[in-house]
Design a protein with these regions (language model features):
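Short, conserved beta-strand element in jelly-roll/cupin
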Residues: 89-105
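Ligand-binding loop in jelly-roll beta-barrel domains
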Residues: 72, 110-112, 116-119, 125-152
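Bacterial N-terminal signal peptides
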Residues: 9-20
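N-terminal secretory signal peptides that target proteins for export/translocation
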Residues: 1-5
Length: 158
């Protein structure tokens, strides 16, 4: 069963990245090919008990890929347009990647993060006040959640 879950996680990850990169326009292809880093928005709980956001760079090895991270499963989610989830914490430490549609996360201080297709979030605010989420734009938001086996905050590929 674990073997099947791992395979599904890998297929989903590869599919998500291919979908993201395949959606690039011709003008963006050159930029995508010359990028040296993969960025993600880390949502974490600060010492004040509030959720905060920061942009992080995922560490890339000489093979142009991150080190392999163990996942415990994969979940695809469709969030209907207009859905709002009031203050909540992440259910576990996980990556969430927007595949289509748009969303928005709000953290402490009213800071809002726009979630466009291809946006990678590292959710680490599993305690404290949490964050809000909403589906915005013209269509449902489709995303993939990849729970990490290592639940140690701050250890994801950086």
């Amino acid at each position: 069963m674990r073997s099947i879950t791992r395979r599904l996680a890998m297929v989903a990850l590869v599919g998500a990245f291919l979908l993201i990169w395949g959606a690039e326009t011709d003008r963006d292809v050159v930029g995508a090919q010359t990028r040296k880093s993969i960025m993600a928005t880390r949502i974490y709980t600060g010492t004040d008990g509030q959720s905060h956001a920061e942009e992080i760079e995922l560490k890339i090895t000489s093979g142009n890929a991150s080190e392999m991270m163990k996942a415990t499963g994969v979940q695809f989610r469709r969030t209907p347009l207009g859905t709002f989830s009031d203050w909540h914490v992440g259910p576990r430490r996980q990556f969430v990647i927007t595949l289509s549609g748009r969303g928005e996360i709000e953290v402490a201080g009213g800071k809002k993060i726009s979630l466009e297709p291809g946006h990678i979030e590292l959710i680490e605010d599993t305690t404290g006040k949490g964050h809000t989420t909403r589906a915005v734009g013209k269509e449902d938001r489709v995303s993939i959640a990849i729970p990490l086996a290592d639940q140690t905050v701050g250890s994801a590929g950086r």
